């Protein structure tokens, strides 16, 4: 009898349904090229388990109540729900092309970007019912929200643009050209910051109308950006150049660049102050000490992309990469 990948996946996930909590905390590393999720012990920095998925996972998001970690499998067209403390599978839900996903600050909405299908879906976060689908010209990629959850800002890589969706009206507020192949998005101090891969800059955008007001050079292939837990530093991964740049959050002035070979992509922050950085082209994760510039290396699966850290004792304190 021929055993399909779907059957093997179901059996593997069944075995994961009753895992004990990880004593030292667990890191979820999403291997987009390996159709898997690596579970890494945060103390030993060793992979302790690998969870298969159907096709091609990329990003994850922690549910507002902190009880579920959602992982999107784009080609598999489903979202998997895991216990963030034990990695036990909770459920699976059909979702079209869930490349990037994120909950609004008020916990009311879940927005899912379908990069391949050129669509942005807005769900009711409580019921998981689709509220509206927005057809997009080309490649909706990353996102972030206004703090009051009134708008979500989505980078459109295929048209060098960004769009703002009014979540109260479920309507497009504006679409504007902002650079060349924009990717990561971050709300900061009343403005929207966008990592613009094609120009090697971080672009500052007015959230009211999409006007570009400033550009900050960070490095070749500026891909994604993340706010530090203390809100003092913005970290920018320059994927093509193999560097990670720190910006002063108050002035947006570059402070320092760190060499991290292998395509630094997403970042999560550990309680000990170190940064976990996925290295997209290297099958590895760098655990960077920002004080020394040195990093430890964690071997994971092929093309690691999104990640989530669940330290010992509190999943709610973890930071998931967008």
Where are the predicted features?
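Bacterial N-terminal signal peptides that target proteins for export
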Residues: 1-11
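Predominantly soluble domains enriched in secretory-pathway, periplasmic, or organellar proteins
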Residues: 11-322
């Amino acid at each position: 009898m021929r055993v399909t990948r779907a059957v093997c996946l179901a059996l593997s996930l069944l075995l994961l349904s009753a895992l004990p909590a990880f004593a030292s905390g667990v890191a979820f590393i999403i291997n987009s090229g390996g159709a898997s999720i690596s579970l890494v012990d945060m103390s030993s920095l060793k992979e302790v388990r690998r969870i298969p998925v159907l096709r091609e996972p990329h990003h994850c998001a922690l549910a507002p109540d902190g009880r579920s970690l959602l992982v999107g499998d784009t080609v598999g067209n489903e979202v998997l729900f895991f216990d963030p403390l034990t990695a036990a599978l909770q459920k699976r839900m059909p979702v079209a092309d869930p490349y990037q996903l994120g909950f609004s600050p008020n916990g009311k909405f879940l927005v899912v970007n379908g990069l391949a299908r050129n669509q942005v879906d807005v769900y009711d976060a409580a019921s998981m019912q689709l509220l509206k689908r927005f057809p997009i010209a080309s490649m909706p990629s990353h996102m972030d929200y206004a703090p009051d959850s009134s708008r979500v800002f989505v980078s459109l890589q295929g048209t060098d643009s960004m769009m703002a969706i009014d979540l109260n009206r479920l309507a497009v507020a504006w679409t504007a050209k902002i650079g060349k192949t924009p990717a990561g998005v971050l709300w900061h101090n009343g403005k929207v910051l966008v990592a613009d891969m094609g120009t090697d800059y971080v672009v500052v955008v007015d959230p009211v109308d999409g006007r570009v007001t400033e550009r900050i050079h960070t490095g070749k292939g500026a891909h994604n950006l993340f706010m530090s837990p203390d809100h003092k530093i913005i970290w920018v991964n320059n994927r093509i150049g193999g560097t990670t740049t720190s910006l002063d959050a108050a002035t947006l002035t570059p402070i320092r660049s760190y060499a991290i070979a292998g395509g630094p992509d997403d970042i999560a922050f550990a309680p000990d102050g170190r940064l976990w950085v996925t290295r997209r082209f290297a099958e590895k994760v760098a655990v960077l000490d920002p004080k020394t510039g040195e990093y430890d290396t964690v071997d994971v699966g092929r093309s690691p992309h999104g990640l989530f850290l669940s330290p010992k004792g509190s999943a709610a304190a973890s930071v998931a990469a967008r």
